[in-house]
């Protein structure tokens, strides 16, 4: 490895600092591999009970939708950035992220823009309605038609579009649906996507508008507070 530093007159050299960082080798130089079995702090039976309870809340009319999840943990050795690189290759998405905070790292991928603000307008792109890609154009066409006519998928989509409208209405005026149930194709799935947008009110601001849309309805359910 050869390092060359080009400096203008009066600039402070940093070549030694760079050499020190390289020689410290404070990064994993070996491949990534898992250690032991994955586990979750929530057992299968507990999670099934949560699902049954969620169904009862829906049947009673307490909520329209509940989004249940549980965390899985997996010990590993190696460079986790390799997992992120594999994710980019296996599941390319419009939004990929990798944050290194020193003591922990967060990475993932998503097709969804939760909330975008530009030139005084805020928009939310609800995604609800999903079918797997088959690799065959004709099969994908049939799955798209099935998706567009599925009562459950359409009901969920309508709910999330209305939720986006409600969230934006807190801080926006002239809220509208820019496009509705647009079919979008990704590497592994077919999605139904809509866009709801509005003009930020003079007495509000982008930060408040953005914060008041959290959490995403696709992650919380609806009504948000009751569902969570």
Residue ranges and their predicted role:
Residues 1-228:
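Extended alpha-helical targeting/anchoring segments
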């Amino acid at each position: 490895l050869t390092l060359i530093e080009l400096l203008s007159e009066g600039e402070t050299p940093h070549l030694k600092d760079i050499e020190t960082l390289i020689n410290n080798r404070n990064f994993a130089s070996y491949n990534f591999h898992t250690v032991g079995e994955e586990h979750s702090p929530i057992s299968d039976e507990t999670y099934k009970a949560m699902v049954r309870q969620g169904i009862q809340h829906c049947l009673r009319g307490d909520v329209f939708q509940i989004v249940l999840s549980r965390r899985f943990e997996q010990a590993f050795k190696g460079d986790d950035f390799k997992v992120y690189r594999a994710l980019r290759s296996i599941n390319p998405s419009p939004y990929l992220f990798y944050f290194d905070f020193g003591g922990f790292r967060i990475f993932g991928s998503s097709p969804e823009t939760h909330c975008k603000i530009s030139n005084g307008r805020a928009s939310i792109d609800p995604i609800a309605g999903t079918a797997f890609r088959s690799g065959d154009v004709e099969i994908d066409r049939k799955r798209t038609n099935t998706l567009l006519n599925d009562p459950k998928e359409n009901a969920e989509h309508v709910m999330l579009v209305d939720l986006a409208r409600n969230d934006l209405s807190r801080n926006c005026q002239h809220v509208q649906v820019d496009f509705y149930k647009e079919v979008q194709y990704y590497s592994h799935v077919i999605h139904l996507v809509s866009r709801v947008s509005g003009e930020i009110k003079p007495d509000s601001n982008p930060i408040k508008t953005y914060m008041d849309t959290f959490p995403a309805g696709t992650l919380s359910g609806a009504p948000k507070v009751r569902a969570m």
